[in-house]
Amino acid sequence: MSATEFIRLKKANCTNCYKCIRHCPVKAIRFSGGQAHIIQDACIYCGECFVICPQNAKWIYSETEAVKSFLLQNEVYVSLAPSFISYFDTGISCMKDALKKLGFAGCEETAVGATIVKNAYEQLIQEEKKDVLISSCCHTVNLLIQKYYPDLLHCLAPVVSPMQAHCRKLKQEHPGCKTVFIGPCISKKDEAERYMEDVDAVMTFDELEAWFNEEKIVIPKDFEACEMSKTRLFPKAGGILKTMVKNQPEYVYLSVDGTEQCMEYLEDIRHGNIHHCFIEMSACKGSCIGGPLMIKRKEKILERNLQIERYAGEKDFVVAQPDENTIHKEFENLEYSTFIPEEAEIRKVLLRMGKKKEEDELNCGACGYDSCRAKAIAVYQGKAEMSMCFPYLRKQSENMTDIITDHSLNAILVLNERMEVQRINPVAKKLFHIHNEADILGESVTTILDPDLFVDVLDKQENVYEKMQYLSMYHIYVETTVSYDETNHFLICMMKDVTEEVKEREKRVAVIAKTAEVADHVVEKQMRIVQEIASLLGETTAETKIALTKLKESISDE
């Protein structure tokens, strides 16, 4: 395992879309706390997650500052990957001049090292020591075999990569110098760290371009011809085969590119379906010119192929072939193995995921795994979270919604913008005398209610709260709240049956009115009695007054 994490995560950008795990050919990504984490021991540095991430949440560790520090202390030589022509759209002479302006002592094409490697391949085929021989130029392919097909390590050509071969040559020619490989590949950073005696640093074309821009170095477009540059074809699919002398009729020469296609070939080799073959194997579709950093630029692969074809010569670079032992390479068994749980444990996880029976296993792949079973195993291994299952989350959400709506004391209706019923809860069904939910779902709300209020809310985009209505069709009073969901374009209606409350209120009003009427009658009667008493008292008083007056007069006369 490399000490450095070359593909890193911007946590703030990760939005749990699971696109990276869906596209990772070896599922070397785990999710924890809603964040993607690369499993270094499992990663083959194909860069697929970096390319595919829609949020740009992955970034590549830059070695630019390390290279700048080299330039202050040492002579530094560049091994430039032949795919530079497709990235910078210029020839090697212009690139050499630009790199010298940055302070590099010199630059050569890695294609020189590719010549050494292809000569070694030809020699191995000539010796016929291997039934199946796989090219070992692509570090991602090497890691794929080392980690996932260690039983096929004997098929890997025991030869250094063009980068290693060339950087060794540069170090021999310039003792004490530092070497920097510059190319389109992320996995070369990992390879360099594993073989530090050959390569001191690896920069991507992106890093170099940023440095040129920083120094305001403009590279002219100039393409010089060079007849002896056949191995400039190495970065295109089938390019290695095109440079090789194929003089062994017993061997079939095959080319395969793309990690998944490589894995299919490796499965066939494992099962003994392929014999007497030399296989050029590249992890990137289109080989190096289809690498992760090339794809990010979005140029068409056909244009890149044409550039490579036009720039390559007809003959090999003139280079002394090193001794076989000096370019020999042994590949370590880096097998990545994980514990596969017992069937009972897998079933337990599936049950927790809501997969109670086989029909529940949708195998939709939204979580990034090919099947629900594979996802359950990943959950058990701690690589995946239960919540990564979209159908599971949806079901959980729907279950929660069902619980809320089904147990609500109010009638709930959900309508679309065409006023069609999308959902109705049990209280609403009872209120509107609906026996079968299917009879109303998808039907116009006009079959059960006057739509005017809903139309008004939709037109004005203004919610209505606790509006009192009398539904004459059902002889009930309701308090109606209608709100519009702009995001999902739904009208949500809640109705509270207040018929009993209204009746109680009407009864109270009637009692109060009756009581007031009785009180008025009593008051009126009392007033009458008072008036009668007053009248009688008045008459009596008058009679008494008359009698007393007469008595007074009679006494006075005497």
Q: What is the predicted role of each segment?
A:
Residues 396-429:
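Sensory modules in modular signal-transduction proteins
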Residues 61-337, 341-351, 370-377:
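Iron-sulfur-associated redox domains of electron-transfer enzymes in respiratory
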Residues 386, 390-407, 504-511, 522:
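Short, charged amphipathic alpha-helical "coupling" segments at sensory-output junctions
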Residues 451-500:
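PAS-family sensory/regulatory modules and their coupling/dimerization elements
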Residues 437-452:
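PAS-family sensory/regulatory domains
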Residues 428-440:
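PAS/PAS-like sensory domain cap-loop motif
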Residues 6-9, 15-39, 44, 48-63, ...:
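Iron-sulfur cluster-binding cysteine motifs and their immediate structural context
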Residues 484-529:
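Sensory coupling linkers of modular signal transduction proteins
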